[in-house]
């Protein structure tokens, strides 16, 4: 009997991390053929052939329509391709088969966030965290959704929890996100502290320099504001981020044009 392959994929999109969980053995009326399609889909996911993976998982599901892993992995491929509604539908199918499929809840939370369904994102991540309260990514997703709902202090709590669980992976982005929430909550000194932490970890983080510069300006420190914004513009240009560079340069011109 053929066994389904185990695949773990981590994809970084901004501050977000998506994980495919371990996969179980399959028993069906067409066990070999379904698993063959499934395993080929896994191989295609690993190779970055997302359309091919979708086709194979679809074939596997025609033979075994109650395979939560196949729905989950097809949803993953659809997510990477930007097919968000299809991804949500497949994560929902995976959860119909297995209501405790924590990664399906977490990834559906993420897709809800991308499609600006912030309340639904919070609901899914809250359910996921009830099943696995040690998954930093779910706190990040929920924090992002709460921040966009204007619940900045609750977002700060989620980012703080993520930082306590995250280890070293992606901490520059989490400090940055928490700094933004502090900015929006009117706590500029706390925001400044987090931008400092973010830049200690990643000294080439152009956006962190930009927002730290704006924070210095709000705190009345024009000299440091200009220095950070100029650094942001230089870094952004070197990284091909023309939009960020233009914003930083415009902010410098605006500050320099004002009377002290």
What are these regions (language model features)?
Residues 2-260:
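Alpha-helical tetratricopeptide repeat
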């Amino acid at each position: 009997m053929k066994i389904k392959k185990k695949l773990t994929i981590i994809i970084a999109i901004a501050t977000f991390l998506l994980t495919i969980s371990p996969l179980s053995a399959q028993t069906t009326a067409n066990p070999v053929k379904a698993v063959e399609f499934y395993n080929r889909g896994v191989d295609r996911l690993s190779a970055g052939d997302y359309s091919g993976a979708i086709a194979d998982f679809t074939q596997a599901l025609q033979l075994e329509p109650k395979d939560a892993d196949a729905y989950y992995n097809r949803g993953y491929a659809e997510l990477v391709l930007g097919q968000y509604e299809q991804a949500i539908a497949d994560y929902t199918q995976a959860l119909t088969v297995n209501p405790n499929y924590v990664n399906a809840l977490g990834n559906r939370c993420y897709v809800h966030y991308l499609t600006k369904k912030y309340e639904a994102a919070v609901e899914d991540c809250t359910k996921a965290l009830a099943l696995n309260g040690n998954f930093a990514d779910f706190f990040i997703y929920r924090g992002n959704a709460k921040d966009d709902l204007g619940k900045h202090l609750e977002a700060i709590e989620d980012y703080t929890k993520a930082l306590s669980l995250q280890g070293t992976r992606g901490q520059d982005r989490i400090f940055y996100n928490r700094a933004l929430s502090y900015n929006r909550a009117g706590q500029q000194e706390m925001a400044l502290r987090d931008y400092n932490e973010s830049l200690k970890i990643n000294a080439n983080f152009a956006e962190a320099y930009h927002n730290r510069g704006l924070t210095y300006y709000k705190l009345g420190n024009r000299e440091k504001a200009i220095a950070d914004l100029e650094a942001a513009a230089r870094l952004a240009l070197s990284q091909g981020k023309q939009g960020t560079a233009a914003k930083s340069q415009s902010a410098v011109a605006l500050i320099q044009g004002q009377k002290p």
